[in-house]
Amino acid sequence: MSVRIVATGDIVLTKSSEDCRDDPRVGALQRMLQSADVVLSSVELPFSDLGHPSDRVLNFRARPELVRELVPYGLTVATLANNHSSDYGWVALDDTRRRLEGAGIRAIGAGADRDAAERPLVLEVNGKRIGFVPRTCLIPLGAAAGPERPGVAAVHIETAWEVNGEYQLEEPGVPPRIRTTPRAEDRSRLLEDVRALARDVDVVIVSIHWGWGFGTDMAEYQRPLAHELIEAGAGAVLGHHAHAPQGVELYRGAPIVYSPGNFIAQQPRDPEHATPEVIAIYEAFSPDAYVSVIDIDEAGEVALRIVPIETEPDGRPALLGDEDAAAVARHVRSESRRRFSTDLLPDNGGFRAVPRGA
């Protein structure tokens, strides 16, 4: 039998459904998600009243009971490997993990030590074994799990600024080139996790928080790391973090989603919880996004289709009408063609990724 996995972007849910206006497009999206075999999301905040805020510019959390608001979206697997799940420390993160599990949602990407945080999840779905590997490359100080420290499953990225002396002499002030590469130990652990899991399951899905927050630009490390993950045995690499839809790539036939944009974006915007500078950051979020539909056929072949959505003014996701969906798809197609030689063709209410020229 085939398996359908739907993957979304980041979830920051801070409102109950009663606080949001009715919109049939929200319900239509929820029904689409509920029909999938697995729904995978990045839950980017703690659902807890425990802990204390970190020493960061942006901290947010939701009331514990709001975790139930995730259920109508069909969420079955939540990765906590991101840069905001630890906003209120380990006690709140662990509380969130337990509350997700209590709501019937499997939590991955955080644990009492590094081994626990990095531990893959294996699900038996329609006779197939699907493995999920979580990581984040965005790591607040002290958030990464260690051998004897709780936290999130992390791949540290080392950054260097490369200055060309000749260019600086001729054109003083020319920006340096920013070089980024995964820390060797973290990269090796991640690739070995994928290799080992690929020997034990039918398909490996890597869920990774990476890149930076806005626009379509990417960090240098992202594409090489994605390719290495597929070479190690991943059937799909599903990225998230950027607050705008980015392109998709087919590498050796396996899909890479660099970022689908936001899914639920209800960051607190009142003056009590956010400064004008922080509110300006939130206002820069793109309302355009998509969800990734991963279809695994009986032979284990993996296909990608994207379904455009938007985040409404109240932060909830909604399906788009045909014209608006086509506009989002044109943007994603342009990025996918330009960067990755990958095209998107209309297919079954969405847009299917194919090699360019196919």
Task: Name these PLM-found stretches.
Residues 1-358:
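Acidic, metal/ion-coordinating pockets
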